Amino acid sequence: MMRDLDLDALQAQLAGTPLQEWACELPGQLDAKLAIGHGDLARWYGAVQALPALPVSEVELARRFAFGGACDDASRAQLKTALQGLIPWRKGPFELFGVHIDTEWRSDWKWQRVAPHLDLTGKRILDVGCGNGYYMWRMLGAGAGSVVGIDPNWLFLCQFLAMKRYLPEQPVWHLPLAFEELPAKLQGFDTVFSMGVLYHRRSPIDHLLDLKDALVKGGELVLETLVVEGDAEQVLVPEDRYAQMRNVWFLPSVPALERWLRRAGFEDVRCVDVSTTSVDEQRATEWMRFQSLPEFLDPADHSRTVEGLPAPTRAVLIARKP
C-alpha cells in the first residue's frame, strides 16, 4: 500500500517549497500508521486491487467527476463489484467507465456553491478532513497545481486509491493522517480547506489557529461548517446528539463565526453561502444503505432535527491570513 500512496511523487512535487522537510518525514510516519492499520483494511485494499486494468481516454474534473474509455461488459461488472466492496460511499458522485456511484451526499451541489468564489489556479492546497477525496479531484478540475488531503479514515483512503489507480499522474495525494499529526506551523499551503470539520472540534478557535498556521502569508482559508441563525453572541452547544451525531460541539451563527475568524487573526473574512441541507442532497442510496438525513429530521417538521434542534444549515466562509 505504501507504493500506492505515491510519496516519491509527492516529495518531488514539494521539493524546494516550505513543505519539503515534512514530505521527507512522511514515509516513516505512514509506515508506522500502516503497521497499526485497521481490522477491515485488508478487505478494503483487496477491493482496490480487484479493480480491472482499463485504459482511461477521457477525464472530466471541472464540471463533474467522470472518466472512461474502452470497457466491455465483463470488465464493467468486475469494476462495479470491486467498487461495491468499498461501500458505504458518502461523498461523490463518481462516474467510472459507465459505472455511476450514487453517493449519500450530492457533494457536487456543495462544490457548485463554493467554487465560484475561489481562484485555485496553480495553488498548492491542503484539504483537512478530505474524506474520500471527491473535493480534491474537483479542486484539480478548478486548476489547482497540487492537492494534499488528510483524513485518518482507512475506508476513505481506499476509495481515493480506487480513483487514483486510474488517474496516477494527477498531482493529488491522500494521507491517512489526522490534522494533529501534521507538524505545527507548516506555513506552506496557498489554500487550506476545512469543510465539515469545525463542529467536530472541542476547541474550534484552536482549529482555526492551526489552519492559519498551515497557510503561507497571504494564503486563503475556505471554511464550511454547520451554523445557526442569530447575532454574534449566538452559539448552539447541543446537550447530547445533534442530528444523531454524538461528536458535535459548537454551532455558531455566521456573525459569531466571522468574529472567531477575526480573533484567530484572519482578515477579509466574508460569508459567501448559507444553505440548509435538503433530503435530496443527503440521503440513503444503493451505495450507502444506512440511515441518512431523512431519518435525522423530525418527520413532522423538517426544519428541526429529531432532537428538536434547528435542522442542518451550512455556511461557507473565506478568509485570508495576513
UniProtKB/Swiss-Prot annotation:
Carboxy-S-adenosyl-L-methionine binds at residues 91, 105, 110, 129, 195, 199, 314. It catalyses: carboxy-S-adenosyl-L-methionine + 5-hydroxyuridine(34) in tRNA = 5-carboxymethoxyuridine(34) in tRNA + S-adenosyl-L-homocysteine + H(+). Keywords: Transferase, tRNA processing. Its EC number is 2.5.1.-. InterPro entries: CmoB (IPR010017), Mo5U34_MeTrfas-like (IPR027555), SAM-dependent_MTases_sf (IPR029063). One of its GO terms (biological process) is tRNA wobble uridine modification. Homotetramer. Belongs to the class I-like SAM-binding methyltransferase superfamily. CmoB family. PANTHER family: METHYLTRANSFERASE, TRNA U34 CARBOXYMETHYLTRANSFERASE. Catalyzes carboxymethyl transfer from carboxy-S-adenosyl-L-methionine (Cx-SAM) to 5-hydroxyuridine (ho5U) to form 5-carboxymethoxyuridine (cmo5U) at position 34 in tRNAs. This is tRNA U34 carboxymethyltransferase.
